[in-house]
A protein has these predicted regions:
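Acidic/His-rich segments in extracytoplasmic proteins that coordinate ligands and/or metal ions
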Residues: 85-154
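Redox- and metal-dependent alpha/beta enzyme cores, enriched for Fe-S-associated oxidoreductases
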Residues: 47-61, 68-69, 246-307, 311-318
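An N-terminal, globular interaction/scaffold subdomain
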Residues: 35-89, 114
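Peripheral docking tails and interdomain loops at the edges
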Residues: 3, 343-383
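A short, acidic, amphipathic alpha-helical segment used as a generic capping/interface helix at domain edges
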Residues: 88, 306-323, 341-344
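Proline-aspartate-enriched helix->loop->beta-strand connector
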Residues: 99, 319, 323-328
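Glycine/threonine-rich flexible loop motifs
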Residues: 113, 335-341
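A charged, amphipathic alpha-helical module
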Residues: 1-34, 146, 150-278, 308
């Protein structure tokens, strides 16, 4: 597969993938394809894919429906939860509307309670995610994955075979490998593309309803980026920033813009929509495929885990491999687990990796754009 279009046009196509998928969703439903929506990187999408379902990301990233959500939820709750619930309650999210079932998980307290309210108007299946990563937790998580499979079989009157699951694992692994290849173009110094363009592809790929298309499209994009870089097309050398913290997208892209409008370049994202979601593969050759899926997903380093060594391991590797000059952590207001973990992250970045760190706390409004630009510009100037 070869890309004929110019790179900016390709990046915009990925940026518009969410809107495109709105239209495709109705076509899928008309054909009778089941749709399974989810809110979290811990969602083992291969199980739903194995029965022929389309999987879609539901997390909302706009403050549009927060006032409606606050009629049921407290004002001092994380904006991601309020926005997600608001879009679901008002039927303003086509993905939620067309989902036959929504899969939740016991990550943070706010989400757990949100799923209770959401289940009043939608089929919601909540997976019991352990908040630790030891052997006993792994046993529980494997049982939950099998319970999810059995729920889908009963709900949709289908049989999900091990062979179906292995096929889905292979498709998703190929997508992860391709996205990781894309990620790695940012190891070049100077970078071939902006961090915002990288993010458009990463975020847009989460709304691809046909997961088997991702690998081919992204690999072709990487080939084009590398060819243009080899011919001398690249950005100027800039301070290299790693973004970590809460899920990023939509309204919070203001943080990426603040970095890149003020002389920096985002070379890597440790967040859920970034390296966390593509760093590990499922072992396709494992004798027990459900055990392999459980191991891969439980190893994700989220702040809901106690302790949370995998987040620090991944961040340390990213800092080294991407020659990071500074780490920017974005925490959402009232996200307790990420806010609490900022102290440990700051210490790790400053003392173990020996580079500067800044934490910015924000929400889904645009009211703090000026303040963000001021703080982030000062941070980049210091590097």
């Amino acid at each position: 597969m070869e890309i004929i279009k110019d790179l900016p046009e390709v990046f915009e196509e990925f940026a518009e993938q969410r809107q495109k998928s709105f239209l495709m969703m109705k076509e899928l439903k008309d054909k009778g394809t089941p749709v399974v929506g989810a809110y979290c990187t811990y969602f083992p999408k291969e199980i739903a894919m194995a029965m022929g379902a389309s999987t879609v990301s539901l997390c909302s990233t706009s403050d549009e429906t927060i006032p409606e959500a606050e009629k049921d939820l407290p004002k001092n709750l994380c904006p991601l939860i309020k926005s997600s619930y608001g879009f679901a309650k008002t039927d303003k999210c086509p993905f939620f509307y067309f989902s036959d079932v929504v899969v939740g998980e016991t990550t943070c307290d706010g989400k757990k309670k949100m799923y209770e309210y959401m289940s009043e108007f939608k089929d919601v299946f909540v997976m019991e995610l352990p908040n630790t990563q030891g052997p006993e937790a792994l046993k529980l998580w494997k049982k939950e994955i099998i319970r999810f499979k059995e729920y889908l079989e009963k709900r949709f009157e289908v049989t999900i075979t091990d062979e179906d699951v292995r096929k889905a694992v292979k498709i998703e692994n190929e997508a992860r490998k391709a996205l990781k290849r894309l990620y790695e173009v940012m190891q070049h110094d100077p970078t071939p593309i902006s961090g915002h363009d990288l993010f458009k592809v990463l975020y847009g790929s989460t709304f691809k309803l046909n997961r088997s298309e991702i690998a081919g499209e992204v690999n072709a994009l990487v080939d084009k980026i590398e060819a243009e870089y080899a011919s001398g097309k690249m950005l100027e050398k800039k301070p290299r920033i790693l973004i970590t913290g809460c899920p990023i997208g939509g309204a919070t892209e203001k943080v990426i813009r603040a970095v890149e409008d003020n002389g920096g370049v985002v070379v890597t994202y440790e967040n859920c929509t970034g390296a966390k979601s593509i760093d590990r593969l499922v072992d396709e050759n494992a004798e027990d495929i459900y055990q392999a899926i459980a191991e891969r997903y439980l190893a994700i380093g989220c702040s809901v885990m106690t302790p949370n060594p995998n987040r620090f391991d991944l961040m340390g590797r990213l800092i080294d491999e991407y020659q990071v000059d500074g780490v920017l952590e974005m925490t959402l207001q009232a996200c307790h687990t990420y806010n609490v973990e900022t102290r440990a992250i700051r210490k790790f970045v400053n003392e173990e990796k020996g580079i500067p760190y800044i934490n910015v706390e924000t929400d889904y409004s645009q009211a703090d754009v000026g303040q963000l630009n001021t703080r982030i510009a000062a941070f980049i100037e210091m590097l």
